[in-house]
Amino acid sequence: GPESAFLRL
């Protein structure tokens, strides 16, 4: 979910 994109920072 959206949290996955956050983890890519």
From Swiss-Prot:
Q: Residues where Leucine amide occurs?
A: L9
User: Which keywords does the record carry?
Assistant: Amidation, Neuropeptide, Secreted
* Chief place of localization: secreted
Choose one Gene Ontology CC annotation of this protein and give it.
Answer: extracellular region
User: Where does this polypeptide localize?
Assistant: Secreted
Q: What does this protein do?
A: FMRFamides and FMRFamide-like peptides are neuropeptides.
Q: What family does this belong to?
A: Belongs to the FARP (FMRF amide related peptide) family.
Residue ranges crossing the lipid bilayer per the database entry: none
Q: Which domain of life is it from?
A: Eukaryota
**GO biological process: one example:** neuropeptide signaling pathway
Protein's name in the database: Extended FMRFamide-3
Show the coiled coil region(s). none
